[in-house]
Design a protein with these regions (language model features):
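Long amphipathic alpha-helical segments with strong coiled-coil/leucine-zipper propensity
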Residues: 2-85
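Residue-level signal for well-ordered alpha-helical segments
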Residues: 3, 25, 32, 42, ...
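Exposed alpha-helical structural elements
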Residues: 18-21, 25, 64, 90, ...
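Charged, amphipathic alpha-helical oligomerization/scaffolding segments
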Residues: 43, 47-50, 54, 64-67, ...
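Charge-rich, low-complexity amphipathic helices
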Residues: 70, 77, 117-121, 150, ...
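Conserved binding-pocket/active-site segment within a compact domain
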Residues: 77-147
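Alpha-helical oligomerization segments
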Residues: 127-173
Length: 173
């Protein structure tokens, strides 16, 4: 999220190894030989792509989001969030606030399902919003790379093969 001027998508994530857990989930959801599927997975992807489209159409919110993320990246440029739990929690809270100030103001809302007791917990809500903000960054990279909603729906095998390749042979920055 905070790597704004990275030379490549791989550099945004510090290499594909850093997103290997996400690649495994993607593989599990797209692989027809896997029985364990989350029916909400594809819906979440479609919702994120739709939200991206609305964000691009609303220049005021888009510019506000860009400004807030740029400020956040500058603030955390020298902070080691991987080894400082307090700073990491603060970053999650700030990302959640940015999500509430921008993406949650768009007409479409992403519905998160789960146990009400866990969803009502404020820290869990912040983690979800932070995750959705980071997911939106990935949607931007997907779109910048030529990806579309239709690609996700009709080129699943190509995406699955790419995920398998990145899992078996991770790319480094």
């Amino acid at each position: 999220l905070l790597r704004l001027n990275a030379p490549s998508a791989i550099a945004v994530y510090d290499g594909s190894f850093e997103v290997s857990s996400g690649l495994r989930v993607l593989k599990q959801q797209l692989d027809t030989s896997t029985a364990e599927k989350d029916p909400e997975f594809v819906q979440l992807i479609i919702s994120l792509l739709s939200l991206h489209k609305q964000l691009i159409a609303d220049q005021a919110i888009y510019q506000k989001l860009t400004k807030l993320i740029t400020e956040l990246a500058e603030k955390y440029a020298e902070v080691d969030i991987y080894n400082d739990e307090d700073q990491f929690k603060l970053l999650v809270t700030e990302c959640s606030t940015i999500y509430k100030q921008t993406l949650s103001r768009l007409p479409s809302r992403i519905q998160v399902k789960g146990e009400p007791s866990k969803l009502q917990d404020e820290h869990n809500q912040e983690l979800v919003r932070c995750g959705l903000l980071c997911a939106m960054r990935s949607v931007f990279l997907w779109r910048q790379s030529g990806g579309s909603r239709w690609h996700f729906l009709f080129k699943k095998q190509t995406i699955l093969n790419a995920a398998k390749q990145l899992i078996s042979s991770p790319l480094r920055e």
